[in-house]
């Protein structure tokens, strides 16, 4: 089962909606992944939704916690530096390079990066994977923005995003060679639910979107629209 990149699947200069790309990937999963495996993932998502994690994330209007994290080249990135430089900060929490939906989202953000930067915003992505894994992801997908490593999900936890992978889903991941202890450098089997934040020039949350369903992400066009509609924030 091979995922097509957004550039491979594009029919023109404009980026296709993520929902279309994700629909194609879901079709491949339905075709090639055993039904019992799909059921485990669906149950895990349902359990997360029952806990209402997305409803309890750090909300719009809150002062965002400051963070300093290493990027894919081990260079320190400070959220305060972006704010002090008078730029808004856009960042996505993702699960890792092993997740096709995270990869699709990052490819989409890569395509619209010039539009993001023209609004006067800085974009970074954050995952719990190690710096080495972030380097591999950055290199493989030719990403043009910093990919930060949040060891132990310390920053994601401050935003209310973390959960422990259920035992049955952990077993499925292990069989599929998704080795989170190796990828993330710890044995916690913790992940963040996918989330997207925009901080204004004062470090206050201007936009917040999260979903317990890792197959659902905000459309890149929506994010650019928020940045354009509030240029002075």
Question: How would you name each of these model-derived features?
Answer:
Residues 1-12, 19, 52, 146-148, ...:
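Non-catalytic interaction/Regulatory regions outside core domains
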Residues 212-230:
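A short, polar/charged loop-to-alpha-helix boundary motif
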Residues 77-78, 206:
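Generic structural signal for well-ordered beta-strand positions
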Residues 150-216:
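Thiol/selenol-based redox catalytic cores and closely related redox-interacting motifs
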Residues 1-63:
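N-terminal targeting signals for export/organelle localization
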Residues 105-158:
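Structural microenvironment flanking redox-active thiols in thiol-disulfide oxidoreductases
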Residues 79-109:
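Short active-site neighborhood of thiol/selenol oxidoreductases, capturing the structured segment around
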């Amino acid at each position: 089962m091979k995922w097509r990149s957004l550039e491979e699947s594009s029919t023109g200069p404009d980026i296709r909606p993520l929902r279309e790309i994700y629909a194609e990937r879901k079709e491949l999963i339905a075709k090639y992944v055993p039904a019992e495996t799909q059921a485990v993932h669906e149950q895990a998502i349902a359990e997360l939704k029952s806990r209402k994690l997305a409803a309890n994330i750090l909300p719009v209007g809150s002062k965002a916690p400051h963070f300093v994290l290493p990027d894919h080249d081990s260079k320190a990135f400070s959220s305060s530096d972006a704010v002090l430089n008078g730029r808004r900060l856009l960042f996505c929490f993702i699960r890792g390079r092993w997740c096709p939906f995270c990869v699709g989202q990052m490819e989409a953000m890569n395509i619209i990066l010039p539009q993001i930067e023209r609004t006067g915003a800085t974009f970074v992505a954050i995952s719990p994977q190690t710096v080495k894994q972030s380097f591999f992801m950055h290199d493989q997908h030719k990403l043009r923005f910093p990919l930060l490593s949040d060891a132990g999900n310390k920053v994601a936890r401050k935003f209310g995003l973390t959960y422990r992978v259920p035992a049955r889903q952990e077993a499925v991941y292990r069989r599929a060679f998704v080795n989170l202890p190796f990828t993330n450098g710890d044995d916690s089997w913790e992940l963040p639910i996918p989330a997207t934040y925009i901080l204004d020039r004062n470090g206050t949350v201007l936009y917040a979107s999260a979903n317990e369903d890792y197959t659902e992400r905000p459309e890149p066009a929506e994010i650019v629209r928020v940045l354009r509609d509030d240029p002075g924030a």
